[in-house]
């Protein structure tokens, strides 16, 4: 974290990042703990929505958020937007709750049983490989490679799931197996107009391309090191915990904005049967997405509306966090802004020169 050159900085208990900034073991423990919280939230919300699901109505008319995602993956015997067998969704919910407990145990194990700094393990050991310093580009690129590897494996899993199990096709109203269309010209052309994608084969082709691209990047970053001397142009003096957090928030903001606009307009990935109709973009106190379906209005919103608005504002605040931490990483001290306003308040200026007053200096000068 940015200390502005001070070595004796202390943080309050609620500054959670300070507890893991220079403790790589605790940093991993916090990651595992966060994963457990996400799993628990997913499982609990699935059970919550299942308890309120009305089998006489399509999912898209009930304003659910989690069930449409499971139905889109072909879980639950979905047909024309109606769940025909909810047992699969129940199994998914219970598995998430079980794994949340496993992750919680792993987080506590890494917090209380293992060393809080992985650098204390013997050189060359497996734990020591994942020890890092925020200004060490060699180790950070090694860890980045493993992140890319898991993202690539996630894309592979999604493509294979659609190929052998099937996903929901809104055009046919049933779950069907989808072969990916790995057409590089299609992938290139949909970089900008991805909102208009209307083919599940193209969607799977895009994920197949991402799987290859991410896996190649993972191999590159795991087995390579930055070329040449580590200079200021490559981040020397800037690479820090604040800088990494800033760039991470920028990436999260970008993905959140993409998800918001995609969910609001695309009806192939977000079928009307599952999420409600497309949305309008409106401007009041702030921009927002509004439902066009007459079933929703007032305090009742579609799943599409929830997803789009939540991701839009989440992306907005992520972007502010990116600027905040980015400026701190560059050395800007926000306390200087407070001092500036204090100085402005202490100066009295009159438009009438005869009545202008000067605030006496707080320092005492010796008599001359």
Curated annotation (Swiss-Prot):
Q: Where are the transmembrane segments?
A: 27-47, 63-83, 89-109, 203-223, 243-263, 307-327
The membrane topology noted for this protein in its Swiss-Prot or TrEMBL record is:
Multi-pass membrane protein
Please give the biological process terms from Gene Ontology that the record holds. photosynthetic electron transport chain
Q: Name one GO cellular component term.
A: photosystem II
The protein's UniProt keywords, in alphabetical order, are:
Chlorophyll, Chromophore, Membrane, Photosynthesis, Photosystem II, Thylakoid, Transmembrane, Transmembrane helix
Write down a Pfam family by its short name: PSII
| InterPro entries linked to this entry | PS_antenna-like, PS_II_antenna-like_sf
Protein's name according to its UniProt entry: Divinyl chlorophyll a/b light-harvesting protein PcbA
Q: Which organism is it from?
A: Prochlorococcus marinus (strain MIT 9313)
Lineage runs: Bacteria, Bacillati, Cyanobacteriota, Cyanophyceae, Synechococcales
